[in-house]
C-alpha cells in the first residue's frame, strides 16, 4: 500500500482498510470517515502469531481464545507496538482481530502487514451491511474499491470484543 492508500472490502460489514503501520494512510482513513481522533479503529491480522508481533507481552491465553472463538473476536490488548500511533488508545491499547474472512485474510498475508479495519461509512452513520449502503462520498474518497462480493446481501453480526490484559485477565466488552 502506498502512503495514502485505502480500499473498500467486505468483512462482517463493508469496511475501509489500509496499512496499519502507515501513519499517513491511517490519517487518510480518519479524514475520509470524518472520525474523531479519540475513536479507535481495529487492526486485522491473518494469524495469532501475527497478532503477537504487534502486542508487547502477548498473553498465551490469547492463542486459545482466538482458536476456539465461535464468531469473529476482537481483542483489546494492553500495549500495541509497531503500528501507526493513531491506532493506539490513550493508554497504549490496541484492538486486533485475527480475520477468518477469506479475502481480508488473504490480503493480510499477501501484503505481510496488518490492516486497519473500520466500517465503510461516515462517523456516526450506520455501518454498510451491503455494498449498496456505502455512500458515494466514501466510494469517491478511497483509492480502490474491491470487486468482490458486491452482490452479497447477507447481513452479518458484529464481532465479540474483549479486553485481555498482559496477565491473562479478560473482560467481555461486547458479547
Task: Identify the function of each model-found stretch.
Residues 127-175:
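Oxyanion/phosphate-interacting regions
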Residues 34-36, 66-69, 86-89, 107-109, ...:
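Solvent-exposed alpha-helices and their adjacent loops that cap or buttress functional pockets
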Residues 10, 29, 75, 108, ...:
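Residue-level signal for inorganic ion chemistry
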Residues 1-5, 9:
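Single conserved hydrophobic/aromatic residue that forms the stacking wall/gate
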Residues 13-74:
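A phosphate-binding glycine/aspartate-rich beta-alpha loop in the early core of alpha/beta enzymes
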Residues 49-53, 81-86, 168-171:
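Short helix-loop capping/hinge motifs at secondary-structure junctions, enriched
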Residues 16, 90-97, 118-128:
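Flexible, glycine/proline-enriched loop segments at strand-loop-helix junctions
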Residues 72-115:
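Internal catalytic-core helix/loop-beta-alpha segment
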Amino acid at each position: 500500500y502506498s502512503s495514502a492508500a485505502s480500499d473498500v472490502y467486505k468483512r462482517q460489514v463493508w469496511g475501509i482498510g489500509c496499512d496499519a503501520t502507515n501513519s499517513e494512510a491511517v490519517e487518510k482513513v480518519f479524514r475520509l470517515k470524518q472520525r474523531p481522533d479519540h475513536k479507535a479503529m481495529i487492526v486485522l491480522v491473518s494469524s495469532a502469531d501475527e497478532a503477537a508481533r504487534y502486542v508487547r507481552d502477548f498473553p498465551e491465553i490469547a492463542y486459545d481464545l482466538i482458536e476456539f472463538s465461535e464468531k469473529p473476536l476482537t481483542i483489546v490488548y494492553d500495549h500495541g507496538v509497531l503500528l501507526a500511533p493513531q491506532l493506539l488508545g490513550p493508554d497504549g491499547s490496541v484492538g486486533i482481530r485475527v480475520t477468518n474472512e477469506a479475502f481480508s485474510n488473504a490480503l493480510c498475508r499477501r501484503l505481510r502487514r496488518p490492516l486497519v479495519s473500520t466500517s465503510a461509512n461516515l462517523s456516526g452513520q450506520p455501518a454498510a451491511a451491503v455494498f449498496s449502503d456505502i455512500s458515494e462520498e466514501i466510494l469517491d474518497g478511497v483509492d480502490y474499491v474491491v470487486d468482490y462480493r458486491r452482490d452479497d446481501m447477507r447481513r452479518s453480526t458484529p464481532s465479540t470484543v474483549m479486553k485481555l490484559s498482559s496477565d491473562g485477565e479478560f473482560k467481555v466488552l461486547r458479547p
